[in-house]
Structure formats: C-alpha cells, structure tokens
Amino acid sequence: MHKKTLLATLILGLLAGQAVAAPYLPLASDHRNGEVQTASNAWLEVDLGAFEHNIQTLKDRLGDKGPKICAIMKADAYGHGIDLLVPSVVKAGIPCIGIASNEEARVAREKGFTGRLMRVRAATPAEVEQALPYKMEELIGSLVSAQGIADIAQRHHTNIPVHIALNSAGMSRNGIDLRLADSKEDALAMLKLKGITPVGIMTHFPVEEKEDVKMGLAQFKLDSQWLLEAGKLDRSKITIHAANSFATLEVPDAYFDMVRPGGLLYGDSIPSYTEYKRVMAFKTQVASVNHYPAGNTVGYDRTFTLKRDSWLANLPLGYSDGYRRALSNKAYVLIQGQKVPVVGKTSMNTIMVDVTDLKGVKPGDEVVLFGRQGEAEVKQADLEEYNGALLADMYTIWGYTNPKKIKR
C-alpha cells in the first residue's frame, strides 16, 4: 500500500471521529504480482489451487448432507491474504466466513461475499458500531457485553445477530459458564434484550486431543440443550457449532449444524492428513555473497564462529519481516534445492546462511524460507521446534509484513 493511501485512510478515520480498527488490508488490485518477485526483499507465494483443493477435499469429507462450513479467515486469512482467497470461498459456495476485525469484514464484502459474516472473538463497542454496514454476526459471552451490543442496536434502530458463546469446553476466554447459577440467570437475561437476535450457540475446544474434546462436547450438549429449552429458542433458527479444524477431522460428533475449519484450509493440519496441501511459501532472494576466513564470527554478539573459510550469502530480511530471532543458528533455508544453515543471529533486516558447499550462488537466486524447492522442503515441524511455538505464530506475521504473490 502506498504511504499516501495509508495517510489518506488515517485522515479520513480521524475526520470521522473513528479510530482505525485494524491494519489496512489491501485488495487484490494492490498486489502487483509481476513486480513482487523482483522488487521486494521477501514475499509470500499463495497457491490458490491448493486452497481450492483443500476446500473441496473438506466438502467431500463432510458430504452433501453434512454440516455447513464456516471458513475461518481471521488474521487476514491466517496471513495468506483474505482478499486473495475470498473469491475462491464464494466460488465454492461456502455460506459463512469467520473473521476477527472490521477490516476483514470490509474486504470480504468488497470481494463479493454476501453470506454470513461471523466474528469469532469478543468485540469492543466501537468495533460493533462500525461493523453495522457489514451485517456482522457478533459473539457474546457475558450479560454486560450483550447489553452494550443491544444498546448500540437500539441507537441505530436495528437488530444485531449474535452467537452465544458457552464455556462448556473450558477455554475460559469468551464464553459464559452455565455451571454457575448466576450465569444461567445472565444467559436468560441476554435472550430478553431488545436489539439483539440470537442466531447461534457455540463453544471452542482448547486442546487438540480426542478425549479432551469429547469431554467438552458432552458438557456443551447439556449446556446448549438447557439454553434452547430454558430460553424457549426456536431450534430451526439457531446454528449450533463447535468443531475447529482438529474436531472437524477427528471428532464427527462435534459437527452439529456447522464446522469452523481454520488451519486445515491453509494446509496447516494434523500431519497424518496429507491430502490437505500447504497454501503458503515464504521466499526471498540472495542479496550478496561474501568470502570470510576461518575463525571469523558472524552477526551480533558473535554467536557463531566459522570453522573453515566460508562463503556466506546475505539474505535481505530479518525479524522486522517476521523471521524470528529464535531461529538463529538453528534454522535452514533452501537454495538450489539444497538445505543451507542459518548462521549468526537474525538481525532486523538481514540473515546470513552458509553456502560454502554450493556452487555458483549469486545475487538474485531464489531462497525458500518455508515451503518446497525441488525435492527439498523447509518443514513446519522443524520451524516450530526452533521457534518454540506453533507455525501460525510466525506465518500470520509474515502475512502482515510481506507482499503476496499468487502462484500461477
């Protein structure tokens, strides 16, 4: 996005007396694919074919009579670019998209999605009010937040559809816990508020383990049934949903009316489900190649010492681009289809890799930081081990800090 465009967006927001709710998300027209590879220091390659394959694979698994799908596209479609992927969701006939920010809602609508937009987290009052044009279905899990949303709806002479989040599975994040006596009273009070219309009941599983999911599922069945009966809700107008990616693959009892797959749509799935393809690759190019003698140290704090005369390739990205410092002296990248080690500490804008054992490495050569090159692959499990966290902890940031190129 051009600096002038961003400045104009911020000024308009200030003039309107509104804060910018989330980072601006560019539309596909802003992605100049022909220029990305040669002009950017690093980029993401997004495989639309793989994304559409994953959607169809899931649809085939669920069957025509199975639950509906709500494609979770929060965090800018897990860093993949919601503007790039929404057209595929529309083409596949997916009836619901789950998002977090109003920016994601705006982009989804502008890209032609006319179905249900469900926010998958609690929202601030300002967010709720600013989301009214997008016909958002909000999430509520407390009487206080429900009252706030109802007040906004009444002020604007409208009704806001809401999903009631239950803490049945023990996430203790958004949901109301009906095992507490006063919470049952609060839940019933929510249903009586003018300005909000219950359209869903949901819970979220905190652990990817079958028995834990089944335990939370049993409580959710009790809680949702109590709420339907005590609240005298019309079951035909309520969408009950609980299954995340793990439960969608492993626990069919959690399907109910709708499933909420996130990671699996992008190929971030249980390793044994190899039919789901990775959608993202993270790439850069060699900026320069330098020759250094044995005994030299590399990078800040001298954390790596060369054991031989070495050729080091300078890669023009660092932790400001989402390549974590935790990967220093542990990770590897792919050049010429071969694994080469990261040496020295990751800098703000630079990492160094040892290419001594390769021939003819030169500026402009493609480097794969995550993904495949020839028969070699930078594996998810390896990066997660080096980083000490889920890969999503990194790739969602990659998406915000690097341009995207559609793989043709």
UniProtKB/Swiss-Prot annotation:
Sorted alphabetically, which keywords does the UniProt record give? Disulfide bond, Isomerase, Periplasm, Pyridoxal phosphate, Signal
Residues annotated as carrying N6-(pyridoxal phosphate)lysine in the record are 74
Q: What is this protein called?
A: Broad specificity amino-acid racemase
Q: Which SUPFAM superfamilies match?
A: Alanine racemase C-terminal domain-like, PLP-binding barrel
How this chain assembles, per its entry, is: Homodimer.
Give compartment(s).
Periplasm
Q: Which residues form the signal peptide?
A: 1-21
Keyword Glycoprotein included in the entry's annotation? no
Q: Needs which cofactor?
A: pyridoxal 5'-phosphate
Q: Detail the disulphide connectivity of this chain as listed in its UniProt entry.
A: 70-96
Q: Where is the active site?
A: 74 (proton acceptor), 300 (proton acceptor)
Chief location bin: periplasm
Reactions accelerated catalytically: an L-alpha-amino acid = a D-alpha-amino acid; L-lysine = D-lysine; L-arginine = D-arginine; L-alanine = D-alanine
Give the UniProt family note.
Belongs to the alanine racemase family. Bsr subfamily.
For this protein, the Enzyme Commission number is 5.1.1.10
Role noted for this protein? Amino-acid racemase able to utilize a broad range of substrates. Reversibly racemizes ten of the 19 natural chiral amino acids known, including both non-beta-branched aliphatic amino acids (Ala, Leu, Met, Ser, Cys, Gln and Asn) and positively charged amino acids (His, Lys and Arg). Is not active on negatively charged (Glu and Asp) or aromatic (Tyr, Trp and Phe) amino acids and displays minimal activity towards beta-branched aliphatic (Ile, Val and Thr) substrates.
Q: InterPro entries, alphabetically?
A: Ala_racemase, Ala_racemase/Decarboxylase_C, Ala_racemase_C, Ala_racemase_N, Ala_racemase_pyridoxalP-BS, PLP-binding_barrel, Racemase_Bsr/Lyr
Q: Which Gene3D superfamilies match?
A: Alanine racemase, Lyase, Ornithine Decarboxylase, Chain A, domain 1
Q: Which residues bind substrate?
A: 173, 348
**SMART domains in the record:** Ala_racemase_C (SM01005)
> Is-annotated flag, keyword Disulfide bond?
yes
Its Gene Ontology cellular component terms are: cytosol; periplasmic space
In the record, what terms sit under GO molecular function? alanine racemase activity; arginine racemase activity; lysine racemase activity; methionine racemase activity; pyridoxal phosphate binding; serine racemase activity
